[in-house]
Amino acid sequence: MKHPGSEKPQRTIAVTGGAGHFGGMVMRRLVEEPTVAKVISLDVRPPGWSHPKLEGVVGDVRDPELARLLEGVDTVVHLAFLISRYKPRSLYESINVEGSKNVFRAAVAAGASQIVYSSSVAVYGLVRDHPVPITEDTPRVHQPDFSYNDAKFRVEAFLDEFEAEHPELIVTRFRMVAALSPGVESMMGRSLTRGVIPSTSDVPWPIIWGEDVADALVLGVRQRARGAFNLSTEEPMSARDLAAAAGMRSLRFPRWLGVLAARLSSIADKLGLGNALDPAWIKYSDAVLVLSSDKARRELGWQPRCNTALEVLQRFRAESSETS
């Protein structure tokens, strides 16, 4: 009879994009898993911390010899993604789309039995006629003029075919709304730390706590869960209502001005002052993106620390002030 915690560590988990902020959150959880013997951080730079179970491997998701680096890996958690659309389009495409395909093919070639992919609410498309709430069965919508959606949509479309070709492979997908976490440079984060919530419409503001996303991914690894899982908070609120409840200021501006500001943010991006915001996020900001996370709660036992958007915002501001 096995006793809790008596499992022998035997799993090796590789995390692409492991040196990033979110990758670090996921790996710090994985090294504490009793069944995990080793966690491999696969990134173009080494992780900024150490642990007896952690191995840093400097590599590129586009490497044609990637399967060699993944030998002996049981599960691949694919987080690597170039967010800024202002990098050369060829680079954006090669890392986010072709790089993802290469990771999945290399994982199978190396003998991995599970792939965990960090997708996004964006795969459903930023459109106005979504059902409320959006479930995992809601059709995905391709928006080629929205680079983030274009990449995430095409990767998931590839995964559909790849999964059908490899029925023995466990494919786990997480589609989350915008995750807030202190220490991540962004236009939105800087605005929130100043006590301002910007918006162009009164649609619900979809946000989630970054730590809760990391928890969900680790649950997917631990349980070897198959399928897609939405991740969001409950009790959605508009930016105006959220600001009032949090004691913050709501800054409402016309959409055209937001698009212009997003385009100008490319200057900050090029200067290394944070990621630029794709103007498409503003262009389609009247989209209603209310996700149901019932499946993740029911099948994974996911219990987020922050259940509502208001709790996410309050925690973000509290922890941001502590680290500033």
Question: For each predicted feature, which ranges?
Answer:
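Amphipathic terminal alpha-helices
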Residues: 2, 293-299, 303-324
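N-terminal Rossmann NAD(P)H-binding glycine-rich loop of SDR-like oxidoreductase domains
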Residues: 11-32
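NAD(P)H-binding glycine-rich loop region in Rossmannoid oxidoreductase-like domains
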Residues: 48, 54, 58-98, 106, ...
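Conserved Rossmann-fold NAD(P)-dependent oxidoreductase catalytic core, especially the SDR/UDP-sugar
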Residues: 98, 102-147
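Catalytic helix-loop patch of NAD(P)-dependent Rossmann-fold dehydrogenases
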Residues: 129-175, 197-198
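Substrate-positioning beta->alpha
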Residues: 154, 186-187, 199-222, 227-230
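NAD(P)-dependent short-chain dehydrogenase/reductase
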Residues: 162-211
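Mid/C-terminal beta-alpha module of Rossmann-like enzyme folds, strongest
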Residues: 216-277, 293, 314-316, 322-324
